[in-house]
Swiss-Prot record:
UniProtKB keywords: Cell inner membrane, Cell membrane, Ion transport, Membrane, Potassium, Potassium transport, Symport, Transmembrane, Transmembrane helix, Transport
Catalytic activity: K(+)(in) + H(+)(in) = K(+)(out) + H(+)(out)
Its biological purpose: Transport of potassium into the cell. Likely operates as a K(+):H(+) symporter.
GO cellular component, one term: plasma membrane
Membrane topology summary: Multi-pass membrane protein
Subcellular location: Cell inner membrane
Name under which the protein is recorded: Probable potassium transport system protein Kup 2
Pfam short name (any one): K_trans_C
Lineage, highest ranks first: Bacteria, Pseudomonadati, Pseudomonadota, Alphaproteobacteria, Hyphomicrobiales
Family classification: Belongs to the HAK/KUP transporter (TC 2.A.72) family.
PANTHER family tied to this protein: LOW AFFINITY POTASSIUM TRANSPORT SYSTEM PROTEIN KUP (PTHR30540:SF79), OSMOTIC STRESS POTASSIUM TRANSPORTER (PTHR30540)
HAMAP family from the UniProt entry: Kup
Gene Ontology MF, one: potassium ion transmembrane transporter activity
Domain of life where this protein originates: Bacteria
Species this chain originates from: Rhodopseudomonas palustris (strain ATCC BAA-98 / CGA009)
Amino acid sequence: MTEAVSDVTLAKASPKPNSFWTLALGSIGVVYGDIGTSPLYALKESLTAASAGGALTQEMIFGVLSLMLWTLLIIVTLKYVLLIMRADNHGEGGTLTLMALLQSVMRRRFAAISLLGMAGAALFYGDAIITPAISVLSAVEGLKLVAPGFDPYILPLSMAILVGLFLVQSWGTAAVATWFGPLMLIWFGLMAVAGTANLMDNLHILGAVNPIYGIDFLLHHGHAGLLALGAVFLTVTGAEALYADMGHFGRRPIQVAWLVLVFPALALCYLGQGAMLLSHPERLENPFFLLFPDWALLPMVWIATGATIIASQAVISGAYSLTQQAIQLGLLPRMEIRRTSETEKGQIYIPRANWLLLIAVLYLVFAFKSSSALASAYGIAVTGTMVLTSIMAFFVMRKCWHWPAAVATAIIVPFLIIDLIFLMANLLKIVDGGWIPLMIGVGLMGVMVTWRRGSKIVARKTVRDEIDLNDFIASISVSSSISRVRGTAVFLTGNPNSTPTSLMHNLKHNKVLHEKNVILRVATEDVPRVSEDERLSYEPVNDSFAKITIRFGYMETPDVPKALVACRPLGFAFDMMSTSFFLSRRVIRQANPSEMPRWQGLLFVNMAKWSDDASLYFKIPTGRAVEVGMQITV
């Protein structure tokens, strides 16, 4: 007997909405941490590249400052704040979110869109590794101005701070995150005040607002101009965070925080540094900290260290979020995901990702030893991500917003040209360390492509060996050799219309069926979060069998037992103590010949070994899970 599919709403208390200004303050502490700490090193590195070891001139200062101000205006304000942030997927943003949005409307170009999304995600990890290293190093280096003899201790102190930061990740940041906004508000306020004070000493620097100075600088400085342009891009590293963190704070609070506070504070700080350097070019050694009087140096070093820790925390949390999305979208193997807060949806901790990030960050600090050396590796990953975002934004305009091709092209092409110019300038850094984020990006891209391809092969071979569920039910209904046992068996499967392998193996070896049998499919949708009234589909097949589909968004952590509780009002009496969950544990072997190149097959086999158990990932108690082994060759 087959009945109509029923939908159920999971009861959930709605959190009290935060006020607009509370969200804006929160965005200052999380979204703008990375871009807000760029004044520590951006102007210094840009002018160092421009002068190429020679004398620093007024023309260089005006030209570089002009490029920095207009880069902030065009890339952050016009491109991200006013355009890209419109391309949300149910309120969420980010590279993989953009990919999922396009996949839902561009099925014919699914593979191409997937490659763009995977490339953007892979490059983000390169940025996530460099940001904590360069941020903390640049802040701690300020101690050299306070105590020149402290130089030998900068590296170990920076590494100690970073180790401490990663060690406390498992505790969660909910308790201290409320302080991020106020602390960064103080940070931006101090930058604005110090910049204004120095600006008032030399108002002539305001002429740098004229874009002609920037254009003239590039036209007359050749190779040094391109190197300086690559360093100028350091002013906007972190701009992707505006889009990626949109789901946590909302579009409007992030936009208002940028226009009202962050952009003016950054502009004043850069102009103040420029004004100071016009009178004191010898201060290029560390123009940020030398904005402040001697008595304020030590407090500013500690405040800057706090700001860089906050910036690093934001990037680390972003890496966790991106990893969770990649796992849910089938781009990475399953990993343990721990929730560190019962109230904040974005508070998660992924142990394996945490330790891999820590090892990579410490390696960078040890290998490069200074923020100036690390600056050569910074920027390539971010520019690559921005190029990919521009390309995907074009397709959003055409396929989601239905804008005419001429309009979409006229808007995106200028941004894309600017992105490509910055990418070209940053590619000059490859031999000086820029190869590192590229290597990380290429490696992670290979990992994601391999996992996706191998998973498709496994799924296809699994379905090929299974039989139709209705045929199976019909065959056992006339069999008298099968014993029935009390309780409920839940069989996880990717295809609810075929008989799960775990069910066939259980019947083959144990010769029994449970009184109630549930064919359970856990689906990941192309939306960040599934509404509770669309979470669950329940379809009774007969008195002994039923089909259930549980839907999760790609930013949700699947909790199967919790979701099954919602079936009780429909007549499915879910009781954990009388329910057994049957899962297929696949042992992957490389076939000969294989459908994948040898290196890719070996990589997939090893990733499958590293993948966490399905019972752990779906929050199924170990004592209620039964794993049935099977071997598949790829």
